[in-house]
């Protein structure tokens, strides 16, 4: 059994987390942990990867084992799926704690996570697709759609002011799977939907949710909110991507003002 040296503990660690915790819940909700182990039972990686035990992670946070938490593997091996919170009787937002630690305590993100966030900040989308390539892909898929359904009036509208729905794409659909673009447009056409997409900011994905970068997350959400206002649409529709839906639905309440985020989001 490992020895815990009390002199090495930093009791203020929980307060440091609470001060920067982007959440709609009690910022100290993790202090409600009962150590019951339901989170560990829910975690898909518990006992599969070393250190992947949410219950132990929370205990380390509460005890103030700051260095062990920051240098451990848990914060980066966690997928932030939220299964632990779903089963937690106290609703402790473990994924939110992981996200907060990733982005606010000087730990370096592994692999290309930060690169993806930087791409989205610098180019408008996380795969650095140029506006020219994006618009050409939409035009190409519009032509394919017209040919397939034998209707020259079928459209993939761009920057249509006053449409009911503003649709956000996954950059992978644009870059690697353009047939998905055609399929979505076909559904919209068959439904008779009054919809559009933006020529400027159209990326549904939001990797600031995973990196813990609140500043980046705010910028990305504001860009989408500006498109909603600019195009005067009623609803925002997000392509099939779980984290993108969460980022738009939950994120706009956290990172935007009530006025900026006053629009419904559908998936």
Spans of model-derived segments:
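Short, intrinsically disordered, charge-balanced linker/junction segments flanking boundaries
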Residues: 261-267
């Amino acid at each position: 059994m490992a020895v815990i040296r009390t002199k090495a503990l930093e009791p203020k660690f929980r307060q440091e987390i609470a001060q920067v915790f982007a959440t709609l819940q009690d910022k100290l909700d993790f202090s409600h942990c009962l150590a019951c182990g339901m989170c560990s039972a829910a975690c898909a990686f518990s006992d599969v990867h070393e250190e992947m035990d949410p219950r132990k992670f929370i205990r380390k946070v509460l005890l103030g084992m700051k260095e062990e938490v920051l240098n451990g593997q848990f914060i980066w091996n966690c997928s932030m799926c939220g299964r632990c919170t779903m089963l937690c009787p106290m609703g402790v937002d473990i994924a939110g704690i992981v996200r907060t630690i990733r982005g606010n305590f000087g730990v370096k993100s592994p692999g290309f996570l930060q690169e993806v966030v930087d791409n989205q900040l610098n180019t408008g989308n996380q795969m650095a697709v140029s506006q020219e390539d994006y618009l050409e892909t939409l035009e190409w898929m519009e032509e394919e759609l017209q040919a397939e359904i034998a209707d020259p009036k079928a459209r993939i509208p761009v920057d249509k002011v006053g449409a009911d729905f503003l649709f956000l794409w996954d950059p992978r659909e644009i870059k690697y799977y353009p047939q998905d673009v055609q399929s979505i447009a076909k559904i919209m056409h068959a439904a008779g939907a009054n919809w559009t997409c933006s020529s400027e900011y159209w990326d549904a994905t939001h990797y600031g949710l995973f990196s813990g970068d609140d500043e980046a997350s705010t910028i990305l959400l504001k860009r989408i909110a500006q498109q909603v206002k600019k195009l005067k649409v009623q609803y925002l529709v997000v392509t099939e991507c779980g984290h993108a839906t969460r980022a738009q639905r939950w994120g706009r309440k956290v990172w935007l003002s009530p006025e900026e985020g006053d629009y419904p989001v559908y998936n």
